[in-house]
Amino acid sequence: MADSSFDIVSKVERQEVDNALNQAAKEISQRYDFKGVGASISWSGEKILMEANSEDRVTAVLDVFQSKLIKRGISLKALDAGEPQLSGKEYKIFASIEEGISQENAKKVAKLIRDEGPKGVKAQVQGEELRVSSKSRDDLQTVISLLKGQDFDFALQFVNYR
């Protein structure tokens, strides 16, 4: 019987992030508590820019955006939001969407699979993803449930299960 395998990746669909951003912008423009405070959210190149005239309003904009991301099924671990910064008369928060698994994080996951996973399961780092293979599909299911039970500081998705 051939080896079964799956890939562990950390990817976010840009279209879903864009949809969440548009929904947040619409809610911000319509909510009464955001009237007259200059609150906005938009793309600024590859970063997301949130603006308002007070620190608590700009953090409220971030909360609205985070709630829209959750509703669209995007993990908040993929969102890297900075601290509110005063810029002129406005507060700004720059946020970015993190994609890919770094080498050190991939090594942590591979070590966890080797140490706590079933015997005969191999994990190989391939760029920004991790390939896990085994002769038994049951072992792969065990590895998936093991990883879902862990609390990593980055989002994980399991793809190409074969």
Swiss-Prot record:
Domain of life: Bacteria
Entries under InterPro entries matching the protein: DUF520, UPF0234-like_C, UPF0234_N, YajQ-like_sf
Recorded family membership: Belongs to the YajQ family.
Pfam families reported for this sequence: DUF520
Disulfide pairings: none
A single MF term (Gene Ontology): nucleotide binding
Entries under SUPFAM superfamilies matching the protein: YajQ-like (SSF89963)
Name of the protein in question: Nucleotide-binding protein SCO4614
Function statement: Nucleotide-binding protein.
Keyword entries, A-Z: Cytoplasm, Nucleotide-binding
GO cellular component, one term: nucleoid
PANTHER family: UPF0234 PROTEIN YAJQ
Keyword Nucleotide-binding appears in the UniProt entry: yes
Keyword Ribosomal protein attributed: no
Organism this protein belongs to: Streptomyces coelicolor (strain ATCC BAA-471 / A3(2) / M145)
Subcellular location: Cytoplasm, Nucleoid
